[in-house]
Amino acid sequence: MTQQPQADAPLAGRHIAVLLGGPSSERKVSLVSGAACAEALERLGAKVSRIDPGPDVAQVLAATKPDMVFNALHGEWGEDGCVQGVLETLKLPYTHSGVLASALAMDKAKAKAVLAAAGVTVPGGGLFNRHDVARDHVLQPPYVVKPNAEGSSVGVFIIKEGANRPPEEVGAPSWTFGEEVMVEPYIQGMELAVAVLGESNGPRALAVTDIRASTGFYDYEAKYSEGGSIHVLPAPIPNAVRDRAMRMAELAHTALGCRGVTRSDFRYDDINDLLVLLEVNTQPGMTPTSLAPEQADHVGIPFDQLVLWIVEDAYARCSAGGTA
């Protein structure tokens, strides 16, 4: 449903294509994010074309002729540098991170190497062949097994302390997340998240959220099912830990070369005062109740204003001489 524009309509006269859906395992989440952003853009006065991209996305965009693209895709192809490369080829301004940062952040092993070199604390472990992981414990339990290039906690297994068997599902023919998997020691404690805005004078961390999953693990269902998790904002942590998480998120945003909005996910072991950055999301969820918009609202940036900032940030980069 087309939204009525605001009286001031700051995006009046703009034609913005919103990419939503796509082919990844996070399609459903992207459809919700994209719908919310498209409605906000219409309230801001823009003409909006909603595009659920397929193999012909370049031709569709060329025929649609938007002024810019709002990328609301999540996961494979939309968040890993692929669609960003298409948009660069078409010379279309687009939101969020560019080709290199998107590809780096999606590849957990490469991202960890870059972040560690920049001084960010990341988990140990590494990449293993999935069949080796399925046959025997490659680390002493407890540990975590996850795809090297997926988001939304898709395909993640936690092997608890004292577990007798490894995650045999990883070696099954039905496994579709690549031949190598990331295996890391399990870090006890709190699940924290920090959203960052890549402002012109440097990245700005917004707040720290404590995420409490009803099942004890913040998996896909906990993230997107009603009642699956509780977001405690601000997180009930010492000020020094809050500041450390925010600075670490800003450093990660810069080290990976990210732009626009990102969200860094952490584990905090309060017993040992260990704060570890798990991953950086270059296309964080953008429903009004997602973590990044929640934090923006917490610091005085309502959802529509956050969407406007994302668009204006992309336009500013374009006018400064880059596609995005």
Curated annotation (Swiss-Prot):
Catalysed reactions listed for this entry: 2 D-alanine + ATP = D-alanyl-D-alanine + ADP + phosphate + H(+)
Alphabetical UniProt keywords: ATP-binding, Cell shape, Cell wall biogenesis/degradation, Cytoplasm, Ligase, Magnesium, Manganese, Metal-binding, Nucleotide-binding, Peptidoglycan synthesis
InterPro entries found in the cross-reference section: ATP-grasp, ATP_grasp_subdomain_1, D-Ala_lig_Van_CS, D_ala_D_ala, Dala_Dala_lig_C, Dala_Dala_lig_N, PreATP-grasp_dom_sf
PANTHER family referenced in this protein's UniProt entry, alphabetically: D-ALANINE--D-ALANINE LIGASE (PTHR23132), D-ALANINE--D-ALANINE LIGASE B (PTHR23132:SF23)
Annotated cofactor note: Binds 2 magnesium or manganese ions per subunit.
Pathway entry: Cell wall biogenesis; peptidoglycan biosynthesis
EC number: 6.3.2.4
Family designation: Belongs to the D-alanine--D-alanine ligase family.
Cofactor: Mg(2+); Mn(2+)
Protein's name in the database: D-alanine--D-alanine ligase
Coiled-coil portions: none
GO molecular function, one term: ATP binding
Organism from which the protein derives: Caulobacter vibrioides (strain ATCC 19089 / CIP 103742 / CB 15)
Annotated residues for binding of ATP: 139-193
GO cellular component: cytoplasm
Subcellular location: Cytoplasm
